[in-house]
């Protein structure tokens, strides 16, 4: 087997397998090591596949550290390839560090021979070729020539590379072994240092515990001198109970300290310290004060509880805090609970206030005292957060949240709840509830009772109502002796006018209301603010729709009616017809046996005007109208407008009290300070008493017509009320828009179903009442297909912002008795926005109606022409099928619409392509004649079918 052949190629390759040293497989894991005094530390533990010596196997380590003499016996005679192998094997086992010596109580370790043999000797036979290659290598002379001849250059290079790689791996393994030994040495040194530190702390802790035990013993002896009975009980308990663990004085003949531990067994933890304050020891032999002494029974019980766990368990729980070094005996306050003394190292304890609360709670539990529940009156608004509710009840928000969780509601302290839920919570916690609302800011402003002793007679407020063009304003003009009608556009009243006249030394306040149907709301406001209603009826026109509406408003307001039959000077006047027509509406005049006063007047010729005023004064005397002029003013807004030079101007009627310049008032959602008072003749007055109409200057904004106003104490109150009303108005507007708008899907469905078109408008008027009338009139014009959408409306001139809004919404601008400024006109020209001006509401409504009619889709009208019966069907080249027909009814026109009817079922509708008679195109074929007809894009025609001819017309519609 020693002979080599040329084909034995594996001779020089196999030995290099013995040179490879596998990298030691290291697995790391982390464990938590516990030390005394409750300290823990995370330790990295490495698990290796190679078997290392443990600290308790000292003989094995020493044997492993020495080189094995038997293995390298033939090393000097081996080939150079085997030298690195033995060197690396010896080097791998050489750098094993000597472990720390085990204590003398440790058991002897096992023999070392079985440990070292598998490490080196078992690797070599695995990679050797069978047949004793190692024994034959000392004879190179016999094989040297043969070996050189059989090894090729590539094989020599492979062997050289294998040797170089083995040397590199050897160096790496040696460096890795050195680092591992260094790390283990550092780890052993650190552990030794920690053990020394732990032993030192344990010794200090034992010394401190001994000192505390001695101090406690002396304190108990001092207390026993004053209280002999508790001392006897304490002694009996001490005799019947073993000494506490590491805390009691030792018996005679027994050394101080803990219980001795058996050999080879670690100590079972440090003694548990008694939780007493350090300053309890007597200083300089002086007895402690009575306040610092504990009761003997209580101290023994506490010691039993503290030491019981140490006696029963294997190891007591270590103390968290580090021992404190006492500087001197006179340091009395050393044991005081402070932040610095209780937060040393990792320890942490309760604060002084927490300890005090705990002591108070313990005292109450011992004395069986319960904390008295304080019931409070909790003010709850309409909405409140849980945190604010807890603060008002002086309760913890956690308790409220727990209560709500029991009720099945998961809420946070910042969540908002309503008043009902807050009331339930407050009552559940034993508090009384006082509900308040945002509307409470208006309490005490309106409907304040008058002082009956200070009331005086006031002028009556008379409203003139009736149908349009029945002479209401002409009658008021005749009474005032002033030409009011000539100043109004179109001769009709556009807004309420309030005037005051004097008759026989007595004042009468008149309110003129429009008679047009669009001004229904203004008539209603006039009736609500009045004492007497004069119903004007034309003698030649009798009762009209607006007359009936005025009667209903007066009855709804509960005011008496005086009928003024006007235009008696006309030839067609019939006053008796008017009285009879009023009977149908339950208005019974005196001449017809009723109680309603009626006067025949002529505003044009000023006939019987005195009788009408006397009837008004008589009715006012029967009503006995009184008011308190010394109280704060209260009334109603008749009309409001935005004047360019004076700002917001409101025409108001004082109902109670007296209004002065400088008063702060609230009108609807607006407030302001009265800057000036102007009467109906344009004169500035210093005060306005009850039933006096005046114009107020100084409001922050333009109020709505019909709003009530009242004088308040200060600006803060006025601002609060105005903000509350503005918030209500915004909420209503949002709710109305959201309810009308809905979701996008609903809008699209509505448009698909109804196909509603909108006509957007921006309306600006002179007064708020006129804008309201225009809005109501335009709403009535709307249908299911088209309606007017008012993007914005307001009192005042047309501004540039109105033009921008109209441009954004693609709306038209309408000005009623107002004009646009220069900037607005220029902007409208640039943007292409149309601005229309109107003075009469009739014209405005007619134009908008015509524009809305243009949005309507034209109506499709169908006119029947005639029927024709198909007699024969012909196939004609380049034309298709042609029906030979006879007109049986009416006529058939070329280009008319046709329907193909088969068995009384319409199977096709289209247009007639050709209409011929004897090969000639004709315009129409009358009844009884035959013709040929062809349809557009349709050939399915049969003999016997009926053709119906009709004409379609599209007619534009109007509203």
From Swiss-Prot:
Q: tr-type G domain: which residues? A: 457-626
Biased region (Low complexity) positions are 63-118, 128-138, 246-284
Any GO MF annotation of the entry: translation initiation factor activity
Recorded hits in InterPro entries, A to Z, give:
EF-G-like_DII (IPR053905), EFTu-like_2 (IPR004161), IF2_assoc_dom_bac (IPR013575), IF2_II (IPR044145), IF2_N (IPR006847), P-loop_NTPase (IPR027417), Small_GTP-bd (IPR005225), T_Tr_GTP-bd_dom (IPR000795)
Where does the chain bind GTP? 466-473, 512-516, 566-569
Q: Which GO terms describe its cellular component?
A: cytosol
Keyword vocabulary terms for this entry: Cytoplasm, GTP-binding, Initiation factor, Nucleotide-binding, Protein biosynthesis
Q: Where is this region: G2?
A: 491-495
Composition skew (Polar residues), residue ranges: 27-37
Report the transmembrane regions from the record.
none
Task: Classify the source by domain of life.
Answer: Bacteria
| Positions in coiled-coil regions | none
- Region (Disordered) spans which residues? 1-374
| Ranges where the record places region G5 | 602-604
Q: What does this protein do?
A: One of the essential components for the initiation of protein synthesis. Protects formylmethionyl-tRNA from spontaneous hydrolysis and promotes its binding to the 30S ribosomal subunits. Also involved in the hydrolysis of GTP during the formation of the 70S ribosomal complex.
Record family assignment = Belongs to the TRAFAC class translation factor GTPase superfamily. Classic translation factor GTPase family. IF-2 subfamily.
Q: Which PANTHER family match?
A: TR-TYPE G DOMAIN-CONTAINING PROTEIN, TRANSLATION INITIATION FACTOR IF-2-RELATED
- Give the protein's recorded name: Translation initiation factor IF-2
Q: What is the lineage of its organism?
A: Bacteria, Pseudomonadati, Pseudomonadota, Alphaproteobacteria, Hyphomicrobiales
């Amino acid at each position: 087997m020693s002979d080599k052949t040329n084909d034995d190629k594996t001779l020089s390759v196999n030995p290099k397998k013995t040179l490879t040293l596998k990298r030691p497989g290291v697995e790391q894991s982390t464990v938590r090591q516990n030390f005394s005094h409750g300290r823990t530390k995370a330790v990295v533990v490495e698990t290796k596949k190679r078997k290392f010596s443990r600290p308790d196997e000292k003989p094995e380590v020493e044997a492993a550290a020495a080189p094995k003499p038997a293995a390298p016996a033939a090393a000097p005679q081996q080939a150079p390839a085997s030298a690195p192998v033995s060197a690396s094997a010896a080097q791998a086992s050489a750098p094993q560090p000597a472990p720390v010596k085990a204590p003398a109580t440790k058991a002897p370790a096992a023999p070392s021979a079985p440990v070292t043999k598998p490490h080196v000797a078992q690797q070599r036979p695995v990679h050797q070729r069978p047949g004793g290659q190692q024994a034959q290598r000392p004879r190179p002379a016999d094989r040297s020539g043969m070996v050189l001849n059989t090894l090729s250059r590539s094989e020599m290079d492979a062997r050289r590379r294998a040797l170089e790689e083995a040397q590199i791996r050897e160096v790496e393994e040696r460096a890795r072994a050195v680092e591992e030994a260094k790390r283990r040495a550092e780890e052993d040194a650190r552990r030794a240092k920690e053990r020394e530190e732990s032993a030192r702390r344990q010794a200090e802790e034992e010394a401190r515990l001994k000192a505390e035990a001695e101090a406690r013993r002396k304190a108990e002896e001092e207390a026993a001198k004053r209280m002999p009975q508790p001392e006897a009980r304490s002694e009996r308990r001490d005799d019947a109970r073993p000494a506490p663990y590491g805390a009691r004085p030792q018996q005679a003949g027994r050394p101080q300290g803990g219980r001795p531990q058996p050999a080879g067994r670690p100590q079972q933890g440090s003694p548990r310290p008694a939780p007493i304050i350090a300053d309890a020891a007597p200083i300089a032999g002086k007895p402690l004060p009575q306040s610092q002494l504990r009761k003997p029974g209580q101290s023994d019980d506490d010691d039993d509880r503290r030491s019981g766990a140490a006696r029963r368990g294997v190891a007591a729980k270590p103390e968290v805090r580090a021992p404190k070094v006492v500087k001197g005996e006179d340091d009395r306050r050393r044991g005081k609970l402070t932040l610095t003394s209780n937060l040393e190292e990792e320890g942490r304890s309760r604060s002084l206030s927490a300890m005090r609360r705990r002591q108070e709670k313990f005292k109450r539990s011992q004395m069986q005292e319960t904390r008295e529940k304080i019931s409070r009156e909790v003010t709850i608004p309409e909405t409140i957060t849980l945190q604010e509710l807890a603060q008002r009840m002086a309760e913890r928000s956690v308790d409220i949240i727990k209560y709500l969780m029991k009720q099945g509601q998961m809420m946070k302290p910042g969540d908002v709840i309503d008043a009902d839920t807050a009331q339930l919570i407050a009552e559940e916690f034993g508090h009384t509830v006082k509900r308040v609302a945002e509307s409470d800011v208006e309490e005490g402003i309106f409907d304040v009772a008058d002082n009956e002793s200070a009331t005086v007679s006031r002028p009556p407020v008379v409203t003139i109502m009736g149908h349009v063009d029945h002479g209401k304003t002409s009658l008021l003009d005749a009474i005032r002796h002033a030409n009011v009608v000539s100043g109004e556009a179109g001769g009709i009243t556009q807004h309420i006018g309030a005037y005051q006249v004097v008759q026989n030394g007595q004042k009468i306040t008149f309110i003129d209301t429009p008679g047009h149907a669009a001004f229904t709301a203004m008539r209603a406001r006039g009736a609500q603010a009045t004492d007497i209603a004069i119903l004007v009826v034309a003698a030649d026109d009798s009762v009209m729709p607006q007359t009936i509406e005025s009667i209903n408003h007066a009855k709804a307001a509960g005011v008496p009616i005086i009928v003024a039959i006007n235009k008696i000077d006309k030839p067609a006047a019939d006053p008796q017809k008017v009285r009879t027509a009023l009977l149908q509406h339950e208005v019974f005049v005196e001449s017809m046996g009723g109680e309603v006063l009626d006067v025949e007047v002529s505003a044009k010729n000023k006939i019987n005007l005195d009788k009408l005023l006397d009837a008004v004064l008589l009715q006012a005397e029967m009503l006995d109208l009184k008011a308190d002029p010394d109280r704060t003013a209260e009334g109603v807004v008749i009309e409001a407008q935005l004047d360019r030079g004076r700002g917001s101007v409101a025409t108001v009627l004082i109902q109670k009290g007296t209004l002065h310049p400088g008063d702060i008032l609230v009108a609807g959602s607006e407030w302001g300070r009265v800057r000036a008072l102007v009467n109906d003749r344009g004169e500035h007055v210093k005060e306005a008493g009850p039933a006096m109409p005046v114009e107020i200057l100084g409001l922050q904004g333009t109020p709505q017509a019909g709003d009530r106003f009242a004088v308040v104490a200060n600006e803060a109150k006025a601002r609060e009320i105005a903000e509350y009303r503005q918030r209500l108005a915004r909420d209503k507007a949002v709710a109305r828009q959201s309810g009308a708008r809905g979701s996008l899907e609903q809008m699209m469905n509505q448009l698909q179903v109804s196909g509603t078109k909108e006509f957007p408008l921006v309306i600006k008027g002179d007064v708020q009442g006129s804008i309201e009338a225009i809005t109501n009139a335009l709403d009535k014009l709307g249908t299911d297909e088209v309606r007017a959408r008012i993007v914005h409306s307001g009192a005042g001139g047309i501004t540039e912002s109105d033009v921008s809004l109209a441009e954004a919404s693609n709306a038209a601008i309408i000005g009623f008795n107002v004009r646009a400024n220069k900037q607005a006109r220029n902007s409208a020209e640039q943007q292409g926005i149309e601005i229309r001006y109107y003075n009469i509401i009739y014209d405005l409504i007619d134009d908008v109606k015509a524009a809305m009619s243009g949005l309507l889709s034209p109506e499709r009208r169908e006119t029947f022409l005639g029927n024709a019966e198909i007699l024969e069907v012909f196939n004609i080249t380049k034309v298709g099928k042609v029906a030979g027909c006879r007109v049986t009814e009416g006529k058939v026109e070329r280009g008319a619409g046709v329907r193909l009817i088969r068995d009384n079922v319409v199977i096709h509708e289209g247009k007639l392509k050709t209409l011929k008679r004897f090969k000639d195109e004709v315009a129409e074929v009358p009844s009884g004649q035959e013709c040929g007809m062809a349809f557009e894009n349709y050939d399915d025609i049969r003999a016997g079918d009926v053709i119906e001819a009709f004409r379609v017309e599209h007619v534009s519609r109007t509203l």
